[in-house]
Amino acid sequence: MNTLQGPVSFKDVAVDFTQEEWRQLDPDEKIAYGDVMLENYSHLVSVGYDYHQAKHHHGVEVKEVEQGEEPWIMEGEFPCQHSPEPAKAIKPIDRKSVHQICSGPVVLSLSTAVKELVENSLDAGATNIDLKLKDYGVDLIEVSDNGCGVEEENFEGLISFSSETSHM
């Protein structure tokens, strides 16, 4: 059994590819890579990992992954190994915060927010979805649907989560 060697950092949960390795991946594998990297990134940021350090990893900007750009590194090149700044520790968080994080995704962009809201409606069985944006989603993102909604026992956690993330 492995024991914890120190604080977990973004480089511990990231996957790197050389240009040649990246070329050998099929399109679905590249999409899965981007999804996993963005999810890892959002989880780390949500538990207090330094946003500015997390957004740049091994020469790859998180925005490049979001935009579907190729995140490969040059063979033998591992810039973060020579970084003057040590990795930030991820601190434990309380149960309430864990519940709030598990209640929904950390929103990295407007398109991610809209996608998650629509997916939530579809997961709830919606067959009709109305989407309203005010000022291109800066002031308001509202999704109305005819789905089953949220079960009563989960409602309280969603209220506190929504109020904390309503100012994207």
Curated annotation (Swiss-Prot):
Q: Which SUPFAM superfamilies match?
A: ATPase domain of HSP90 chaperone/DNA topoisomerase II/histidine kinase, KRAB domain (Kruppel-associated box)
Cited Gene3D superfamilies? 6.10.140.140, Histidine kinase-like ATPase, C-terminal domain
Q: Which residues form the signal peptide?
A: none
The molecular function GO annotations come to: ATP hydrolysis activity; ATP-dependent DNA damage sensor activity
Which residues are in the KRAB domain?
8-84
Q: Name one Pfam family in it.
A: HATPase_c_3
Q: State any GO BP term from the record.
A: mismatch repair
GO CC annotations, alphabetized? mismatch repair complex
Query: Record's SMART domains?
Result: KRAB (SM00349)
Report the sequence similarity comment from the record. Belongs to the DNA mismatch repair MutL/HexB family.
Additional detail? Encoded by one of the numerous copies of postmeiotic segregation increased 2-like genes scattered in the q11-q22 region of the chromosome 7.
Protein's name according to its UniProt entry: Putative postmeiotic segregation increased 2-like protein 3
